[in-house]
Amino acid sequence: MSAEENKALFRRAYEELWNRGNLSVADELIAPDFVNHAASPGSNRGPESMRGSVAWARNAFPDLHFEIEGLVAEGDMVAGRLTVSGTHEGSLTGEPPTGRSVRNTHMHFVRFRDGKAVEHWGVREDLGMMRQLGLVVVPGPRLLGRMLVRRAKKLRSRLPAGR
């Protein structure tokens, strides 16, 4: 297939599977020997793995939406820059819903063969998402300053007297 045809398949997969949650198209778009390198080993093969990933994400973010900002294709590989948004209304790795909205940039790389995805790699900014959800606190300048002062005092207390 041409690079343009592969880009069209990439767009369709994100629109149908991820944005609409239409899991019935997984067998049509995902090869039986598909490997999702961004998923946990043991749950990363075949169309069923993609159905599981989509269902998990859409459970946590029912209004999940991937906006394709740009695609580059060469041969059988398509690289996409996407903006992902959604509202945390379901469990996310054991964390209860926060009701907060998130917006992140993802990079996804998909290799196609005979009109189906055979490999996927994803680069996500999960720490930023967790910060937006209020699940991770990153120290600000004041807290960092206090931490450094405490650490310096502790280190000074270990120095021999008179130094």
Model regions: which residues?
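C-terminal and inter-domain tail/linker signature
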Residues: 1-163
